[in-house]
A protein has these predicted regions:
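Phosphopantetheine-dependent thiolation modules in NRPS/PKS and related acyl-activating systems
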Residues: 1-39, 44-47, 54, 58-85
Length: 85
C-alpha cells in the first residue's frame, strides 16, 4: 500500500532543495501548513505535481472535473487520496 504522505513529503523536499535551497527542509509536513508559506512557488508546485505524476502514475489535477486549489498541505494530500488509482 502506498504511503502518500511519505511519498509527497519526500518529493516535496526534493523540489524544495532544487527550487529554493535556502529554505529549511521539512521532516514532516503538518496538515495545517499553508502552501503559500511552504517555500515552493508556482513553478515548484508544477514540478512537484509532474514528479508525483511520474512516481504515482496519475495527476489528480488533470482527473478532477472541477478545479480545486488547495491552500494547506492537508487539502493537497486529500486531493491525491481522493483520486488515487
Amino acid at each position: 500500500m502506498l504511503d502518500l504522505r511519505k511519498i509527497i513529503t519526500k518529493t516535496f523536499n526534493e523540489v524544495l532543495k532544487q527550487t529554493n535551497p535556502e529554505h529549511k527542509i521539512y521532516d514532516k509536513l503538518d496538515d495545517d501548513l499553508v502552501l503559500l508559506d511552504s517555500g515552493l512557488d508556482s513553478l515548484g508546485f508544477a514540478i512537484l505535481v509532474a514528479l508525483l505524476d511520474e512516481e504515482l502514475g496519475y495527476d489528480p489535477f488533470q482527473i478532477m472535473e472541477e478545479p480545486i486549489y488547495p491552500s494547506t498541505f492537508d487539502e493537497f494530500l486529500k486531493i491525491y487520496e481522493i483520486h488515487k488509482k
